[in-house]
């Protein structure tokens, strides 16, 4: 039974009663202002019923964009939300007006109940966020990220060997690649298989927190007083099963934040530590004997930044393999360039990046076509504003539809790296899709340089080392379906393929 089964009916009922007066006041005070178009909704509850009845609320957004245009307004219990689907709008609001558009919604479930309060992605904009941002910029800037290149290349080499040995387990091996990279860089912990307890913790804490938020998080964000349902509701009362679900998730979050952090500290104490985010942060603050409990809280949150990159890295790579199977001519062109530039006695490295322009365009198209997320985490405006004649009241959540922004180009379904070389077929897609995928303005992902290096290293070495081909069924090639799951992370539906080593570089990774 999922969390939603326990709480949807009672929490919605309580919330409806609690909000009538507030919503009516907001409706009366705002009804004469010009707002963006959007679904009309009902008095008091707004568009709640449409969102609840949808299998996944975010799947409604592309439909609303198609129906109402590039800027769409919807409400839930009087709380304003604006969905934007043009890159130019995101730049104007979230970057140029970043001083007032950099807050987050009050994420009560994630930050106050589940324990992600030190995580920058969901942190409110203020002194604590600026402190974390300063620390992350020092430890994750482009020059600092280059210091981890050897880790990317070592872990990607391990990926190649695993794929050569077990090509049918490619999902598993790509997951290990993404997870191992994160734990090496964040904590100096080497992970070689998915049976490791830390893999379970990292995957479980992030995935279960996201599921809990989709089930009920938005409601408790609107009505923080409902926290008692999560913290104090009697365990013997009806509908109390969700309490155990929440407590279990909280326990996993605590362990995911604490266990690898303590392991990294222990390696520093016994002198076996190599460079990591944790060791760099602790050293920068004066060492193990100098850091305060507040410092440690901040460092745990900083190290956990990269957890979010684990899933998006895996999604990007698995989607790109799917694209290569459907566009073999693109795969061959990228391989030909690599073979022409990189000597056959080694694999491409990040030091080669500037000399392989088609591969760079290939990676950009991978971010666009294989877009790992449907929407970005919402920004919240901290004061009233006006955009293109539309009134945007204080407290409005701005939701960037990443997927739509990256598909506003001719032949969007085609995987075509040339669009980033000659500039044709770009449409309204920015020249660098990373400007969308990694977020906007002051909320841009601080780990973007590490994440981008991880994606580039994997794709470059996969292209150099293997051919990705359709599955053979009764001697005939069968293309995998272009279908995706219904979560906000765009995992492709499980597919099968052939992964065949390229003989000219097999010696570079074979044991």
Swiss-Prot record:
Its EC number is 1.-.-.-. InterPro entries: Cyt_P450 (IPR001128), Cyt_P450_CS (IPR017972), Cyt_P450_E_grp-I (IPR002401), Cyt_P450_sf (IPR036396), Cytochrome_P450_fung (IPR050364). The chain crosses the membrane at residues 2-22. It is a single-pass membrane protein. Pathway: Secondary metabolite biosynthesis. Its cofactor is heme. It catalyses: erinacol + reduced [NADPH--hemoprotein reductase] + O2 = cyathadiol + oxidized [NADPH--hemoprotein reductase] + H2O + H(+). Belongs to the cytochrome P450 family. This is Cytochrome P450 monooxyhenase eriC. The gene is eriC.
